Amino acid sequence: MLFLLSDLGGIMEKILEFEDVISETKDYDRNILLGNGFSMAFDEKRFDYSSLLEYSQRIPSCVKRIFNTFNTSDFEVIIKKLESSAQLLKAYDRRLTTSSRLYQEANNLRDELINRILEIHPSSQNDIEKDRIFNTLFFLSNFNKIFTLNYDCLLYWVLLNREDFLKKYPNIEIFKMDDGFRPYYNELAWKQKETQNVFYLHGALHIYKNDYGLICKPHNDGRYLMYVIKDNIYNNNYPLIVTEGSSKNKLNKILKENNKYLSYCYSKLKGIKDVLFIHGHSLDKKDKHVFEAISKNLTIKTVYISLCSKENYQEKREKADTFFAKREREKTLDVNFYNADNINIW
């Protein structure tokens, strides 16, 4: 067990070990929320989205100057800036020429983000060693429900290997992972089911709305997923993902764009109970809507947040206090940190 000294009144806080926390919570309903750190643990260089700009060759120089002006390489931040500027200009100038251009640049940048994410993926799940996938399944087997903010395909590929995992490790208890998709002709269509226990809160690259308005995912074994996604984009069946820059705009897309899948996943997060692990998330305010939903859920008793050696403990503790300190009806939420460095996720 690791100890860190807090600057707040000299209080010593325990940084717990993951295995100890799992043992202590064995009698509770355990849930997990995955952030980008989950994907970066697979390949930090590939899935550090701050580096996507380096690989983007089709962004106009005027938009790249905006990245430089705000000293950021975060696509979502610039998408937010373009959208808010367009909204302001629309109110100021009724000719709409400049605001329309900014809206278009925001959409172009969103498409570029999708293309870059596709390019940084392994070409198929066959490029990922089975042992790494099994390590991830060992980790996920500790939880009853999985929520993820990542829209890459890593989790999808991992879950496809559940049966192979059980064949090799028949004595390991792992729940039946259900993402809510069911056979529908040559696709898998999403249907609202209480048995669903895997939730892509911000959508995912493999999830799309077909020509009939159904939320679908490809009916394949994952080997050619990248080709399927690119073909879908070519046919204007774009991935269902939330790339808006601000928490407000993200929540608007989830709740106000007639998106039953995203709104259902969000509602299920608000309905979990007992224990929630937040793994691989910096607690950035861009996901404030998620943390507010957690804080308002009075059936959650304890939150465990991952902390790795590269992170600033004090900064993360202050963020956690900001999001989770205030609850309705004077209910308290117990917030603890656990050491992420000793977990073999991949």
Regions found by a protein language model. Name each.
Residues 2-32, 38-40, 264-346:
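SIR2/sirtuin-family catalytic core signature
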Residues 45-54, 160-166, 216, 293, ...:
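Short secondary-structure boundary/capping segments
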